[in-house]
Design a protein with these regions (language model features):
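Conserved C-terminal structural/oligomerization subdomain of aldehyde/semialdehyde dehydrogenase
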Residues: 1-7, 18, 22, 54, ...
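ALDH superfamily catalytic-core signature
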Residues: 1-128, 152, 156, 184
Length: 227
């Protein structure tokens, strides 16, 4: 979640773009803590789309043994077929604004034989009615930009995942951060508050650290919250 105060030119905006790009592409997005929903202020949607697209465009897909390659393949062709199917399902209710299922380059490997996949960025302009992005998970480098108009909407959208392992809010407004955490916490295993002051010490959005909760309510766990 991008805070309303985290506008282009702030350290927090840059942190947000960097963190989202990292969580989309590390292990080709095949992580249970990867960012699937990018919740941003409606007024900043265009800025986020442009900045994130520019950063994702630097992704070099291919054989990880080759210098310069920074994203490898999916686990296998079966996984590629599954992610492709999920992307096609998501495409029915939202628009791809970066990436392609076919038009991308692969370095040092055969694109047609390997399970390579381009980062795919969606935009969902009506996330309260077009709910696929909350219910369909493409387990690869796939994520959706979702606009909100106020912190209450951001909380509601975050909770529409019906249980998530981890959520982050990137803001320097501690009042807004507190309101978000109080409202969204019961649907998340953990929530990271990230800003310039703590960035150098932060392990990041998706780090599975021994002392952090790695599980959660609803879809994020096996019912541990129910005893």
């Amino acid at each position: 979640v991008l805070g309303e105060d985290s506008t282009p030119g702030t350290a927090e905006f840059d942190l947000f773009i960097k963190e989202v790009q990292k969580e989309m592409t590390v292990k080709a997005g095949q992580k249970c803590t990867a960012v699937r929903r990018i919740i941003v202020p409606e007024k900043l949607v265009d800025d986020v789309q442009i900045a994130l697209g520019q950063r994702l465009s630097k992704t070099i897909i291919g054989d990880p043994q080759i210098e310069g390659v920074n994203m490898g393949s999916l686990a296998g062709n079966e996984q590629k077929e599954e992610v492709t199917e999920k992307v096609n399902q998501l495409s029915k209710t939202q628009e791809i604004v970066f990436g392609s299922l076919e038009d991308f380059e692969v370095t040092g490997a055969d694109k047609n034989k390997g399970a390579f996949f381009s980062p795919i960025l969606f935009l969902n302009n009506d996330p309260f009615n077009n709910k696929d992005c909350h219910n369909i998970e493409a387990f690869g480098p796939v994520s959706t930009i979702i606009p909100y108009n106020n912190i209450s909407e951001a909380i509601e959208l975050a909770r529409m995942g019906k249980g998530s392992l981890v959520c982050s809010i990137v803001t320097n407004d501690m009042k807004a951060a507190e309101e978000f955490v109080r409202g969204a916490a019961s649907m998340h295993g953990r929530i990271l508050v990230l800003n310039e002051a703590c960035a150098k010490e932060s392990t990041g959005h998706g780090s599975p650290m021994p002392l952090l909760t790695h599980g959660g309510p609803g879809r994020a766990g096996g019912g541990e919250e129910m005893g």
